[in-house]
Curated annotation (Swiss-Prot):
Protein family: Belongs to the PINc/VapC protein family.
Compartments reported by the entry: Secreted
Binding residues for Mg(2+): D8, D101
A GO cellular component annotation in the UniProt record: extracellular region
Keywords in alphabetical order: Hydrolase, Magnesium, Metal-binding, Nuclease, Secreted, Toxin-antitoxin system
Gene3D superfamilies the UniProt entry points to: 5'-nuclease (3.40.50.1010)
Family annotation (InterPro entries): PIN-like_dom_sf (IPR029060), PIN_dom (IPR002716), VapC_family (IPR022907)
Biological role stated in the UniProt entry: Probably the toxic component of a type II toxin-antitoxin (TA) system. An RNase. Its cognate antitoxin is VapB27.
Subunit architecture: Interacts with cognate antitoxin VapB27.
Protein name: Ribonuclease VapC27
Entry-linked SUPFAM superfamilies: PIN domain-like
EC number: 3.1.-.-
Length: 137
């Protein structure tokens, strides 16, 4: 059985926003496969969609509807991992802003998902967690 495909915000936004410079490339890469937002990327993608420049910004309900329609059920971090999150992060020596990338990677790892990204900086954290990373190009 093929592992689920998870995407982070760096893939979700160009997939959803037609005027994004990477839209065509990401849509071609995606090829209409079922994909799920992963961990913190769900909230982050919603945040970006609702704070884009005025002519592109979505109303909150429109953003929620778009995320529900375009993506499979989100892959979220288990309560067990969340309960021990500081210790888990410390074991991987993850600090600062990389914590948010780790939330995405930990959720992907728990669901045995491939994690698609376009973010070279986050990729290092994802790989540190041990998730299988795919570069969406």
């Amino acid at each position: 059985m093929k592992p689920p495909l998870a995407v982070d915000t760096s893939v979700a936004i160009p997939l959803l926003v037609r005027t994004h410079t990477a839209h065509a490339a990401v849509v071609a890469w995606w090829a209409h496969r079922e994909a799920a937002l992963c961990g913190h990327a769900l909230a982050e993608t919603y945040s970006v969609l609702t704070r884009l420049p005025r002519d592109l910004r979505l109303a909150p309900m429109d953003a929620a509807r778009l995320l529900t329609e375009r993506f499979a059920a989100p892959l979220l971090l288990s309560s067990r991992t969340t309960e021990h999150l500081p210790r888990v992060l410390a074991q991987f020596e993850i600090t600062g802003g990389a914590v948010y990338d780790a939330l995405v990677a930990l959720a992907a790892a728990e669901h045995r998902a491939e994690l698609a990204t376009r973010d070279a900086r986050a990729k290092d954290t994802y790989e540190k967690i041990g998730v299988h990373v795919v570069v969406a190009a």
